[in-house]
Amino acid sequence: MKKSILFFFLSFTVLVNSQTEAIKYNNIQTDFFFGRPIEHDKKLKDAIDGNSYGILLSFNKINTKNTNFNKLYNYPERGFSFLYQNFNSDVLGEVFGGYRHYNYNLKNTSSSSLKLISGFGFGYVTKSYNAITNPNNHALGSKLLASAYLKLQFFQLLKKEKLSINTGVSLIHFSNIALKNPNLGINTVNLNVGFNYLLEPIKFQPLQEEITTNELDKKVYFNLILRGGYNESLEIDSGIFPFYTVTFYANKTINKFSDITFGTDYFKSEFLKNHIKNKNLEEGKTYNENDYARVGIFVGHELIQNNFSFVSQIGYTVYYPFPYVSRVYERFGLKYKLGKHLFSEVTMKINLFRAEALEIGLGYKF
């Protein structure tokens, strides 16, 4: 999952060819996919019975506003998509998903339509963990889930006036972000075949002005973010507790697409206090129940999307009084500029493959 997400962010750095056509089309696409869930934890062995399959229906609307953003990203499409997936497993069942997605045109030729599609939304699974009726489902602890997908579309089998058949690969992720355990999550790698139909043509005049690097503000800025939310420990039915995170970091713009970041996190997760207490009682440990704060340092990247940015970070916990999953952590999510100084964030903190928390944050840029 992490490698696929990192590939997603790095792929955007090759978007340098500008769109010169003056006609675009809204379109709909139906993808049929077939794949295999990834057994990233041995506890998933009894849940994964075989290959999964499903259908993804997408409604795509072209963005023709003459802005620097659209010119930089080759006039991307955006829209809504709906998914049905059958895990072909009595443990995992079926899942339905709804997403807001973005399509980025990496390359367009007569025989190739290289696109990168990212979708973020929610899912509903028919079978979740139950201690009595479904004890082997360590992937999904609740029926309501967070979900995301990445799709790389790279080859056209057929292209007519309005109809085309496209192939590609995709990665689909479901989890409940540690709001209810167990929560190993489920990731599926798929092969896709998509049928695309063009709707009404849209004529527009592409922006011709070039953007030079001299226009970029490459100063180093400092940022302070307060994050919070609720989550549960690894212990099933141990209850949800609030958590708080204070982040201070520096950022610098390096090109038209990217900022790099470096900073530190202070984590205060109330569930750890209860978790440490239980471990001391059950295993005879002597950890200090009141010493459960953690401190980490991280480096990161922000992919600039107008007022939005895609955030990716990898960090290491330097103050670690109690061992919990992993010292290494990752953070992925969205950042939105509210003004010159204020911004908001919605991010997912992950310890290796295991989601720890969905973070809601408010930040200030100095």
Feature annotation, model-predicted:
Residues 40-45, 91-94, 128-135, 177-184, ...:
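Outer-membrane beta-barrel translocator domains and adjoining extracellular loop/strand segments
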Residues 1-30, 114-116, 163, 195-199, ...:
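Bacterial Sec-dependent N-terminal signal peptides
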Residues 19-67, 206-251, 365:
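Short glycine/proline- and aromatic-enriched beta-strand/turn motifs that initiate or cap beta-hairpins
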Residues 37, 187-207, 355-366:
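Outer-membrane beta-barrel "beta-signal"
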